[in-house]
């Protein structure tokens, strides 16, 4: 069979990850020719990667999205030459795999020669249309998903298809692409008498979900022999998953790939860490570490103690907290090297005397300039001593003296210490976590959720620090990883955390000086220190690692109960704030669960058709200036306040 493949690719820097070449290596076995169409840039690395499979590489302006990329490829051949192929395969880099040979799919579909076009998977449509913009239909039709669609020869030769592509208008954005192409293509040509089908049959799931490949990918891969899965699975918002599931699809998918296939998991990790927000993939994959109070693998713990270099870095300022700091250090294995900074010679002598009683490998105390507090001491004086260590922990004697009542600040310190260093077994278990996961770069305690800290947590943990963190990351450190105000950083608020020194090397190597930090008195927020506190996870990501939260098992129970209490107490007030009509709907619900369901039905990313319809109606019927005024006011009051978003 003479088969042409058209592969669409977009990546902002034009870099081609290995998951793409893995996919193309199998796809190319089933093709006679391959053309790659790149929107925007294609790096030298990317060109070399694609050149393994074809010399026909088109790099075009980044406009028109996938639709115009495909159109460009079709136009480059012309209909006469395209008509010589038995099949034309159009696919793109939103898919990962395969987990089984693609030939199985091509052979199976070749048995049905009555089809004019076919695809990999189906979207079952919806009674309403959730996408904004001008709608061809007031509902979402059942359709072949555009990530993999195949045209047969007689379909390519048909005037209808040729006119469709010849007259395709420029595509403005994602919603325009869906409305003019993906969601309507199947129905438009079915209505004209053309026959179609999909390889992965999911008619039995149409009452289960409208999007099987995203909501139940494991079922499709295991039971329906689907060879491919969505890259989006790992970065899809957890809130969207929670509209349809308990959040389990991605964890199940990963377990299936790990335990039942030969698919190289490194291909997923490398792409996630390079291109995705850890806030999304760490939640979807349940990467938060819950640490038990007893050692789980004694043999491994002993091996780590014998063969790995372990360091504890501490900044000690408050001598009335020295006993607490010693108790923290006493939980570390005796092979640990401890590096301590303080601001006065008298304090140094007191610390050295106290720590001499602890069974540690070495203790080094340094007097440093009292500028930049714990963050300045860590980067300027302690970090240079940590090069060459495998695993390290940083802590300081935290006193949130500006927080009233004092119990709120003290509990912040409890959250940090309880989850980073609950006991000696906790420390060994954390070391095993790093040993078992080569991509783990940082483990941070969770953001405090009590007192006034709760509202900061609800705002994503940025406070007034998004712009200064972004500037530090992009301009000062010149690191290129995803950062957005709508994505919460998995950061060590309180500056107590575990890390691999290699993961923070781009930050450590900057050459920090105490003059980089403002003198006392420091503002309560918005300083370079607060930006550094939030930049740690992004630095680790740029170095090829990911950050995750860590909790002791006891605190995880507390955290769960805390979140349950907040959810119960806030659902109705939130409903009143967001939308009066929603409030009355929620207040009429018989239970808290029903109220939650009502709110998610209105505000959930997929089940929010009423909200989307209202927004679309406003956009379509109001003057542009009036519509923008309404949306601007809404965003100013209720958010979202940062980054790309939909209302």
Q: What are the functions of these language-model segments?
A:
Residues 1-647:
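ER/Golgi luminal nucleotide-sugar-dependent glycosyltransferases, focusing on the catalytic module
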């Amino acid at each position: 069979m003479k088969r042409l493949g058209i592969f669409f690719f977009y990546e902002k820097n034009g870099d081609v990850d290995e998951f793409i070449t893995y996919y193309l290596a199998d796809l190319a076995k089933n093709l006679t020719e391959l053309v790659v169409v790149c929107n925007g840039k294609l790096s030298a690395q990317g060109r070399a990667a694609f050149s393994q499979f074809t010399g026909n590489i088109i790099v075009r302006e980044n406009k028109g999205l996938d639709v115009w990329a495909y159109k460009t490829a079709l136009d480059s051949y012309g209909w006469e030459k395209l008509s010589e192929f038995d099949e034309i395969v159009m696919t793109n880099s939103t898919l990962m795999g395969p987990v089984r040979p693609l030939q199985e799919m091509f052979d199976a579909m070749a048995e049905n020669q009555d089809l004019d076009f076919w695809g990999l998977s189906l979207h079952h449509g919806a009674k309403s249309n959730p996408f904004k913009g001008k709608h061809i239909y007031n509902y979402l039709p059942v359709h072949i998903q555009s990530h993999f669609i195949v045209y047969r020869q007689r379909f390519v030769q048909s005037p209808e298809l040729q006119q469709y592509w010849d007259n395709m208008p420029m595509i403005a954005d994602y919603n325009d692409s869906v409305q003019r192409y993906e969601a309507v293509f199947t129905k438009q040509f079915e209505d004209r008498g053309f026959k179609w089908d999909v390889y992965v049959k999911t008619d039995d799931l149409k009452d289960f979900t409208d999007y099987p490949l995203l909501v139940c990918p494991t079922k499709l891969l295991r039971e329906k022999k689907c060879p491919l899965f969505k890259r989006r699975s790992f970065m899809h918002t957890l809130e969207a998953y929670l509209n349809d599931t308990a959040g389990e699809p991605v964890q199940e998918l990963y377990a299936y790939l790990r335990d039942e296939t030969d698919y190289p998991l490194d291909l997923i990790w490398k792409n996630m860490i390079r291109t995705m927000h850890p806030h999304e993939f760490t939640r979807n994959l349940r990467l938060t570490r819950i640490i038990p109070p007893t050692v789980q693998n004694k043999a491994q713990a002993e091996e780590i103690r014998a063969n790995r270099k372990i360091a504890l870095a501490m900044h000690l300022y408050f001598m009335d907290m020295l006993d607490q700091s010693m108790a923290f250090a006493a939980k570390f294995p005796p092979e640990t090297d401890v590096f301590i900074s303080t601001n006065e010679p008298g304090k140094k002598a007191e610390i050295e005397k106290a720590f001499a009683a602890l069974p540690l490998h070495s203790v080094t105390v340094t007097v440093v300039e009292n500028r930049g507090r714990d963050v300045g001491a860590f980067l300027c004086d302690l970090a240079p001593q940590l090069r060459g260590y495998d695993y390290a922990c940083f802590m300081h004697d935290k006193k949130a003296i500006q927080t009233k009542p004092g119990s709120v600040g003290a509990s912040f310190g409890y959250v940090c210490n309880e989850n980073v260093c609950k006991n000696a077994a906790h420390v060994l278990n954390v070391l095993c976590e790093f040993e078992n996961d080569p991509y783990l770069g940082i483990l941070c305690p969770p953001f405090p959720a009590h007192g006034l800290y709760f509202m900061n947590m609800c705002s994503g943990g940025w406070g007034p620090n998004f712009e200064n963190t972004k500037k530090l990351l992009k301009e000062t450190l010149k690191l290129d990883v995803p950062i957005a105000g709508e994505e919460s950083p998995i950061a060590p608020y309180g500056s107590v955390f575990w890390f691999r020194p290699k993961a923070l090397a781009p930050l450590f190597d900057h050459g920090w000086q105490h003059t980089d930090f403002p003198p006392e008195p420091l503002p309560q927020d918005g300083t370079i220190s607060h930006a550094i506190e939030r930049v740690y996870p992004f630095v680790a990501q740029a170095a090829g690692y990911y950050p995750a939260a860590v909790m002791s098992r006891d605190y995880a129970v507390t955290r769960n109960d805390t979140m349950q209490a907040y959810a119960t107490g806030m659902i109705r007030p939130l409903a009143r704030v967001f939308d009066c009509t929603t409030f009355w709907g929620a207040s009429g619900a018989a239970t808290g669960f029903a109220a939650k369901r009502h709110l998610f039905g209105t505000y959930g990313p997929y089940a929010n058709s009423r909200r989307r319809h209202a927004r679309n109606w406003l956009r379509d019927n109001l003057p542009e200036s009036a519509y923008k005024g309404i949306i601007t006011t809404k965003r100013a009051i209720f958010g979202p306040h940062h980054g790309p978003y939909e209302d």
